[in-house]
Amino acid sequence: RSESLQDILTCAMGLDVHRDIIVACLVKGAVDAEPEAETRTFSTLIPEMQKLRDWVIESECRNIAMESTGIYWQPIYEMLESCFDGEISILVVNARHMKNVPGRKTDMKDAQWIATLLRAGLLKGSFIPDKAFRELRHLTRYRKSVVHDITAQKNRIDKFLQSSGFRFTAFLSDTFGASGRNIIRHLIEHGSIDREALDKCLKTKTRNRIDEILVALNGSLSEHQRRFLNMVFRHLEDLEAHKHTVEDESTEEVLKHTDTLNLLCSIPGIDVTAAAAIIAEIGTDMSSFPDSQHICSWAGLSPGNNESAGKRKSVHINKGNPYLKS
């Protein structure tokens, strides 16, 4: 026990989390005396994590802290957050914060040091939203991934058409608008397009330039090219349908927070999809953030203000939360 640390908790547990093992140290005792420390090691398999949970309950330890090590902390957090009917404090701490605290003995294990700092009240946990919002995150972040896949698939199709001699982008503002998709479907079926077929594919506004567009599409696809275009185009349509499925699921979840949803949607440029992403990342309880400056900093939208001798230095915003920023 470091003489420079003043204990405020009678019981605390520190977890040193790795990919395959969890080292847990329980420190317990009066705040004005040397505490007893007990260390146990568990694997990261579910039965072992259940043993850790049982030890927490048996010890009646309601204050736990661990480093935010990759994704390895997540199943442990999920396992422990329901202990004592939710009346438990679990801090997920940035490792940099603990390294900056002086007083650590050279032979002290990581788990014991975490428990020691927690017992002294020197740890500040990262923001972890409630389970319902973490589950909503799965959907909103997955949607973002699907949108990325859709963009990649569109680029793949556009590149293939360009390499096959079809210059869609020369006269169509959107290759995948209604006119562009009609043309692609016709090429898949017939391999080429004539003026009459093109006239049926084009919408009213683009028909005025039908002769120019016909020149840009004056090519033909081989049997192999038609089959390949069919495959990649069907994949695009499947991805788009899947995106709608994910959006429907996330909308169903976010409608449980109608007041917050309506408030966010009242902001110009924020629709239900964007509002769902915001709610998933920060929840609806803003008490974790003292003011707007804190949440902007957490999101990574507050640039530094480095000034020396009247000269301002160029600075960048921090990484923050990339899902909230985008």
Describe each model-derived feature in a short phrase.
Residues R1-S326:
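A detector of single, family-specific signature residues
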